[in-house]
């Protein structure tokens, strides 16, 4: 189901949902600064609040996430700044609607798709970066411990690797061969299980999808957890992929409300076009998730959840 917005001309790529004091916030990718929406209910009208970042000389803000720590709000987001392409930054605000400022660059390389989480063992940042030293080169999912919200340990662990043709990013990104993409990690724990959801493939392709990995453990040091990708035998096993009413389904976040899990993700309506030029049509959607004993299934409907 599409989310309902009071401002209908915009797209909402890479949506991250966040709840604070009974209000829901949605943060999305945008060129001039991370854009935000606000709503009192998941399926009611979302009000456009504009750009909430206050970075200097930066653009192409991608895939933000937000965490609240001791009455401060921290946003982790990649952007283009100082001729550095999509390096991960952190910024702080006193309100969920910003302005997020006092930014700091966290890594000196391409690093995208954050999800900062806190366990009893500390802060851990899930994100994606490139690995060129493998048979299947491309973007992988990593986790790094943080000393404080601004300071990574800078010793990330590679967690998920590509395995399937459906995880290729096309058109090819290298002259040498195929490029594989795992990105958009989102971690949560339910019962005895830890879940690591992710996006795979190219957002313009039919095979772009959301999958997940699992670990049955109470381990709080997330760098010590060994996640196993959920597969259908030797084939990929998407939780969310294109269906009869939407395509381009990917990059998501998860929220638990009234003991029910929901995924908020972007997708596109089907559209007949003869042009090869990409037009941004990704909009935020929502579906209910069933999460039970290491298994996630999605319940998707076109006009309700």
Regions found by a protein language model. Name each.
Residues 1-305:
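Carbohydrate-active catalytic/glycan-binding domains of CAZyme proteins
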């Amino acid at each position: 189901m599409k989310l309902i917005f009071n401002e209908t001309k915009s797209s909402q790529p890479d949506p991250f949902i966040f709840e604070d004091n009974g209000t829901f916030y949605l943060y999305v990718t945008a060129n001039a600064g991370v854009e935000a929406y606000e709503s009192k209910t998941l399926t009611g009208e979302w009000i456009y609040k504009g750009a909430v970042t206050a970075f200097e000389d930066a653009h192409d803000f991608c895939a933000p996430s937000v965490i609240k720590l001791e009455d401060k709000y921290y946003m982790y987001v990649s952007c283009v700044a100082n001729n550095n392409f999509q390096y991960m930054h952190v910024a702080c605000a006193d309100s969920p609607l910003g302005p997020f400022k006092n930014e700091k660059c966290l890594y000196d390389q391409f690093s995208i798709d954050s999800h900062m989480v806190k366990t009893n063992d500390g802060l851990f940042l899930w994100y994606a970066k490139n690995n060129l030293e493998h048979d299947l080169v491309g973007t992988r999912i990593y986790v790094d411990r943080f000393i404080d919200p601004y300071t990574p340990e800078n010793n990330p662990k590679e967690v998920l690797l590509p395995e399937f043709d459906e995880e290729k990013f096309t058109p090819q990104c290298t002259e040498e061969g195929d490029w594989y993409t795992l990105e958009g990690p989102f971690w949560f724990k339910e019962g005895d299980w830890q879940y690591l959801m992710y996006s795979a493939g190219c957002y313009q392709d039919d095979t772009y999808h959301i999958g997940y990995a699992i670990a049955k453990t109470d381990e709080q040091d997330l760098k010590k957890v060994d996640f196993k990708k959920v597969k259908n035998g030797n084939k990929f096993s998407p939780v969310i992929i294109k269906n009869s009413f939407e395509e381009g389904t990917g990059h998501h976040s998860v929220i638990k409300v009234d003991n029910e899990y929901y995924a908020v993700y972007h997708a596109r309506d089907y559209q007949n076009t003869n042009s090869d030029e990409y037009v941004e049509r990704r909009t935020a959607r929502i579906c209910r998730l069933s999460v039970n004993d290491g298994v996630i299934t999605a319940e998707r409907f076109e006009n309700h959840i």
